[in-house]
């Protein structure tokens, strides 16, 4: 190995890593190969995965794979540039039209990822002199977008309409514009936001609302439509990318002002084609979309947990090391359920985040519930 070029930098990194190790918070990459359905090979051994966000099992669906392959052969491996230069391949317009239609909006804009979408949307719409109110459990990328915006940002207690209303009543008058940020399905808790009620509040205070539907699209039924509906192509759609659905005027503005759209290479056309095929499958096969929630509710009923509201069910453990130990115990029994630790979740709330897929068999769900019961982790 060559000698370090920057000893002080390495010393800094090693000290930080030591602290992460001591707290049980160091992350490591573990090669994991999907082998079909909800099964995978991890560390050389087969497991049933309950940590994958491919909620509908479409990432390996023959029609989705075929659409990606056809686009790959026609357009090549990459888009070749920013979409505003040479990277706007025809499949993007098809995908955006389908997303907008499904969401009941005039237009849509596809980004490089859901994270990039939130990094671009909020700073393009809000800035100094504006007010942002965000659910305290909003995803990291929503918070990152607020910080980039420069707007005054205040969290409201999770799904607490009274607190949100009080903040609007107190703060809205001094702000030029107000933007409310929430998730339709919260990624770490699996519960749902009262979107219709939030929209009613927003209208009464002339505030705009952005709903992050990353974990809801294709899995939970439709509810009220927000003026700004964003999400990802990487979960139920089994592909990669992010999007915003909104009015034509807003989409045109974002096309010019969202820095994470303007200054980055467009998605590979194959990813867009795969997402488009997945959207069409969801519409053609509604029974597929109903399955993850049904399996999640089967699981919560077996363990006496609150009824699942989405395809995500948390099993709270508490401390990070305890969550890691439980995850290892499950993996020894053939189940991959990754421990979620701070800072992804608040300190003291480390958990197993269990994600259900249409690819799971009922017997696999029952076996996981039995394993958790035997380990004394739930119920």
Swiss-Prot record:
Keyword field: Acyltransferase, Biotin biosynthesis, Pyridoxal phosphate, Transferase
Q: What class of enzyme is it?
A: transferase
The record's disulfide annotation reads none
> Which Gene Ontology BP terms does the record give?
biotin biosynthetic process
Q: Does the keyword RNA-binding apply?
A: no
Superkingdom of the organism of origin: Bacteria
Q: Which Gene3D superfamilies does the record match to this protein?
A: Aspartate Aminotransferase, domain 1, Type I PLP-dependent aspartate aminotransferase-like (Major domain)
Residues at which substrate binds: 27, 34, 139, 344
> List-wise, which residues carry N6-(pyridoxal phosphate)lysine?
235
Pathway, per Swiss-Prot/TrEMBL? Cofactor biosynthesis; biotin biosynthesis
Does the UniProt entry include the keyword Acyltransferase? Answer: yes
Please write the reaction equations for the catalytic activity of this protein. Answer: 6-carboxyhexanoyl-[ACP] + L-alanine + H(+) = (8S)-8-amino-7-oxononanoate + holo-[ACP] + CO2
Quote the InterPro entries the UniProt record gives.
Aminotrans_II_pyridoxalP_BS (IPR001917), Aminotransferase_I/II_large (IPR004839), AON_synthase_class-II (IPR050087), PyrdxlP-dep_Trfase (IPR015424), PyrdxlP-dep_Trfase_major (IPR015421), PyrdxlP-dep_Trfase_small (IPR015422)
Query: Which co-factors does it depend on?
Result: pyridoxal 5'-phosphate
EC annotation from Swiss-Prot or TrEMBL: 2.3.1.47
Record GO terms (molecular function): 8-amino-7-oxononanoate synthase activity; pyridoxal phosphate binding
Q: Which PROSITE patterns match?
A: AA_TRANSFER_CLASS_2
Listed binding positions for pyridoxal 5'-phosphate are: 114-115, 187, 212-215, 232-235
Functionally, this protein is described as follows: Catalyzes the decarboxylative condensation of pimeloyl-[acyl-carrier protein] and L-alanine to produce 8-amino-7-oxononanoate (AON), [acyl-carrier protein], and carbon dioxide.
Which family is this sequence assigned to?
A: Belongs to the class-II pyridoxal-phosphate-dependent aminotransferase family. BioF subfamily.
Q: How does it assemble?
A: Homodimer.
Q: What is this protein called?
A: 8-amino-7-oxononanoate synthase
The source organism is Methylobacterium nodulans (strain LMG 21967 / CNCM I-2342 / ORS 2060)
């Amino acid at each position: 190995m060559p000698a370090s070029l920057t000893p002080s930098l390495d010393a800094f990194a090693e000290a930080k890593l030591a602290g992460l190790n001591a707290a049980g918070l160091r992350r490591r990459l573990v090669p994991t190969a999907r082998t079909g359905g909800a099964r995978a090979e991890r560390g050389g051994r087969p497991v049933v995965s309950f940590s994958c966000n491919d909620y509908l099992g479409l990432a390996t669906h023959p029609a989705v794979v075929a659409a990606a392959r056809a686009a790959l052969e026609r357009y090549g491996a990459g888009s070749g540039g920013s979409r505003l230069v040479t990277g706007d391949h025809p499949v993007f317009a098809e995908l955006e039209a389908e997303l907008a239609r499904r969401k009941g909006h005039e237009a849509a804009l596809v980004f490089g990822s859901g994270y990039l979408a939130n990094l671009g949307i909020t700073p393009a719409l809000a800035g100094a002199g504006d007010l942002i109110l965000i659910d305290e459990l909003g995803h990291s990328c929503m918070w990152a977008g607020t910080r980039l915006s420069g707007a005054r940002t205040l969290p409201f207690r999770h799904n607490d309409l009274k607190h949100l209303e009080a903040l609007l009543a107190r703060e809205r008058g001094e702000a030029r514009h107000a933007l409310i940020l929430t998730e339709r399905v919260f990624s770490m808790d699996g519960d749902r936001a009262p979107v219709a009620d939030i929209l009613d509040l927003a209208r009464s205070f002339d505030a705009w609302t952005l709903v992050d539907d990353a974990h809801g699209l294709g899995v939970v039924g439709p509810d009220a439509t927000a003026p700004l509906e964003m999400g990802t192509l990487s979960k139920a759609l089994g592909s990669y990318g992010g999007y915003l659905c909104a009015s034509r005027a807003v989409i045109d503005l974002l096309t010019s002002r969202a820095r994470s759209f303007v200054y980055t290479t467009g998605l590979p056309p194959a990813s867009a084609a795969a997402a488009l095929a997945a959207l069409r499958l969801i519409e053609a096969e509604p029974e597929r979309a109903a399955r993850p929630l049904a399996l999640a509710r089967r699981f919560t009923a077996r363990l006496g947990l609150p009824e699942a509201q989405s395809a995500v069910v948390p099993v709270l453990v508490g401390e990070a090391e305890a969550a890691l130990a439980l995850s290892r115990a499950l993996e020894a029994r053939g189940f991959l359920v990754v421990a979620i630790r701070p800072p992804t979740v608040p300190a003291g709330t480390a958990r197993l985040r269990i994600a259900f897929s249409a690819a799971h068999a009922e017997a696999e769900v029952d076996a996981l519930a039995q394993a958790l019961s035997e380990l004394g982790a739930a119920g």
